[in-house]
């Protein structure tokens, strides 16, 4: 085998300046070239160089700079939402670090980075050295962080005209309509968002439990959230998880309801009680921790990114998005963009309840100057409910795409 002629022959022929086309009469070592190939190699015929607005600068395959800027109104048609896709090991986190460094240098936006694995720790250190304020949040037991998932319930009492339907028959129609009219702006459905949070607490994010949830159950949940909101607004305090649990138990005492409905209400209240005690109670059943004013907020999902914490992760993410939304509403006239970056997005988006929520909230963000950037590794992880979100996002960056 060591003395095989063919490998040695090929090695010699492929040495620089050794190959002689005239000697290759059978055309074993040559192939047809098209005029396009020659044009691509010519210096007068280059590759795309982008829009010329250097918000983000990369290099194309020819080594020339390619520039584009999602935050520039001249570069976008609809929005600056961005989707970064690539298989494992393709460099999503490294690319995001590169992009965020460039965008921060040019626009100095307010950044909210949700990650798992400390991929942006050095970026935070670098930004802090250059004078930016950096706030780090770790979602783990004992971290002292408190997220109030029902904190926005006061809006239901403050603006009752904007409360969406409580009719059980119309609830599924809302979901069908959400998949249509992606381009249209819509009012925020606060009651629908709070219902999603309550359902996640009741079902624990389990498919089997979610399948048991009927439209009548959902209507009762919405009514109990409204009851809790009215009670807490009268007492001038934040709506906590225990208030919704108590409202479910109170309605279960209603003698006019059938026994089966009352038993179901008690069952849902007991399920929510898991989020009112222990570590989950510390995180989700206290008045929310005030977020300090910072240029960059890095949220490490930590414990919640592991298996078995699906409900806690989803509720925490909803609370984070609500926090970003409140800041965006407050600062919408300051002209400073807000970018919410989610790395390892497949951890978040695989929950079918979260996708409609993200679709609704990000549709509003276009008017508030806040942008949703998502990085994930597998499109198959996205549920069908996430299709409107993908249609809405204008900017896609694909890294080393697999053949299929």
Model-derived segments and spans:
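Hydrophobic anchor at the beta1->P-loop junction of P-loop NTPases
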Residues: 84
């Amino acid at each position: 085998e060591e003395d095989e002629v063919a490998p040695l022959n090929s090695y010699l022929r492929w040495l620089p300046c050794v190959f002689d086309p005239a000697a290759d009469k059978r055309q074993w070592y040559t192939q047809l070239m098209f005029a396009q190939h020659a044009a691509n190699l010519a210096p007068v015929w280059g590759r795309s160089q982008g829009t010329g607005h250097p918000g983000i600068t990369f290099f194309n395959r020819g080594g020339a700079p390619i520039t584009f800027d999602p935050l520039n109104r001249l570069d976008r048609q609809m929005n600056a939402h961005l989707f970064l896709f690539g298989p494992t090991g393709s460099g999503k986190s490294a690319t995001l670090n590169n992009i965020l460094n460039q965008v921060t240098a040019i626009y100095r936006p307010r950044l909210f980075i949700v990650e798992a694995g400390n991929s942006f720790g050095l970026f935070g250190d670098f930004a802090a050295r250059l004078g930016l304020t950096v706030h780090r949040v770790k979602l783990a037991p004992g971290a002292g962080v408190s997220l109030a998932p029902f904190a926005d319930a006061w809006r239901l009492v403050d603006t009752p005209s904007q409360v969406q339907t409580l009719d059980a028959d119309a609830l599924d129609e809302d979901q069908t309509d959400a998949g249509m009219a992606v381009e249209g702006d819509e009012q925020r459905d606060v009651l629908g968002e709070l219902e999603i949070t309550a359902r996640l607490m009741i079902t624990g994010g389990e498919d089997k439990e979610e399948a048991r949830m009927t439209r009548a159950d959902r209507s009762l949940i919405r009514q109990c959230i409204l009851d809790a909101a009215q009670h807490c607004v009268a007492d001038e305090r934040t709506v906590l998880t225990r208030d919704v649990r108590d409202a479910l138990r109170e309605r279960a005492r209603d003698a006019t309801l059938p026994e089966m409905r009352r038993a179901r209400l008690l069952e849902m209240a007991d399920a929510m009680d898991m989020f009112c005690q222990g570590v989950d109670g510390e995180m989700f059943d206290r008045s929310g921790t005030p977020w300090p004013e910072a240029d960059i907020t890095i949220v490490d999902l930590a414990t919640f990114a592991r298996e078995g914490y699906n409900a806690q992760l989803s509720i925490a993410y909803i609370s984070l998005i609500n926090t970003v939304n409140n800041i965006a509403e407050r600062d919408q006239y300051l002209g400073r963009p807000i970018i919410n970056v989610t790395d390892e997005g497949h951890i978040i988006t695989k929950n079918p309840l979260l996708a409609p929520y993200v679709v609704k909230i990000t549709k509003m963000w276009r008017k508030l100057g806040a942008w949703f950037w998502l990085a994930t590794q597998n499109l198959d992880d996205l549920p069908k409910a996430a299709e409107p979100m993908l249609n809405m996002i204008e900017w896609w960056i694909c890294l080393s795409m697999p053949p299929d």
